């Protein structure tokens, strides 16, 4: 029974993984997320985040609602890095120069805020900070593209 459950979990994980890019090509979805205590979007064009990300963030943070402020797609070759500007103040750098690792650095007004190093696989990287007492922001780097 335990073996069957393990096999089912593996099949579900593979089935839910995004399709692989061409060899050496890596596509990432970068999202700028804002968390608020309001039920209405904090800005024009902001939309609720997808259910998967919402559940992940609500497991950790008590913020009432999370909004996608901006979304960008980044295509990188292995062993390269790129910096993506978001909303004029924030930026993220995705660095694939170390084989098997994905380094993500966040910047605000050109100043380094944080750096995270993760395996280069399919998992998402979430980094962020406080906007003020009632608002938080996150930059999410993920391989899957939400609806």
Labelled PLM ranges:
Residues 6-14:
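Bacterial N-terminal signal peptides
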Residues 20-147:
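Outer membrane pore-forming secretion/assembly proteins and partners of Gram-negative envelopes
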Residues 1-4:
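Positively charged n-region of N-terminal signal peptides that target proteins for export
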Residues 17:
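Glycine-rich phosphate- or other oxyanion-binding loops that anchor nucleotides, phosphorylated ligands
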